[in-house]
C-alpha cells in the first residue's frame, strides 16, 4: 500500500512522516515517534488507556487513523510537562495517589486534562461522568476523582492557570 505524507504537530513539535493509510494513531505515536506514554489496552475504544488530545478533543488513538491527524495538533501525556515541571493534572495524580498499576494512567491524565479545559470547576458527580470513558481495574476511582479535584483547584491558582 502506498504511504501518505502527513504533517502533524505533536506536543508542540512539527512532524512530517510517511505512513500507511491504515496505520492507527497509537502505533504512529509509539512506533514512529517513540512516544510510548499512551497504552494499547482493548483496541476497541472501550478502556481509554490510549487517550490523546487532538485539536481540543479527547480521542481514543487505538481506533483513530494517523492520516486523520494530517494538519492537526496532537497532545500526548508526554506533553503534559513543561521543562520538567508537572502539569497540574499529573501533579494531582501524584499527590492524591490516583494510580496503582499505572496502565490506565496516561489515558486518565489526558481525559482529565481535556475535561478540566471544558469544565474548570467541576463537582464530584461531573468528574465521575466526565471520566466515564476511561476504565481502571485497580483504584476504585475515588483517588482518581480526588486527583482531578486537586488539579482543578491547582489550575485556579494564578501561578498555575496557564500550566
From Swiss-Prot:
It catalyses: CO + a quinone + H2O = a quinol + CO2. Pfam families: Fer2, Fer2_2. SUPFAM superfamilies: 2Fe-2S ferredoxin-like (SSF54292), CO dehydrogenase ISP C-domain like (SSF47741). PROSITE patterns: 2FE2S_FER_2 (PS51085). It is an enzyme of class 1 (oxidoreductase). One of its GO terms (molecular function) is 2 iron, 2 sulfur cluster binding. [2Fe-2S] cluster 2 binds at residues 101, 104, 136, 138. Its EC number is 1.2.5.3. [2Fe-2S] cluster 1 binds at residues 42, 47, 50, 62. Its cofactor is [2Fe-2S] cluster. Residues 4-80 form the 2Fe-2S ferredoxin-type domain. It comes from the Bacteria. Binds 2 [2Fe-2S] clusters. The keyword Endoplasmic reticulum does not apply. Keywords: 2Fe-2S, Iron, Iron-sulfur, Metal-binding, Oxidoreductase. Catalyzes the oxidation of carbon monoxide to carbon dioxide. Dimer of heterotrimers. Each heterotrimer consists of a large, a medium and a small subunit. This is Carbon monoxide dehydrogenase small chain. The gene is cutS.
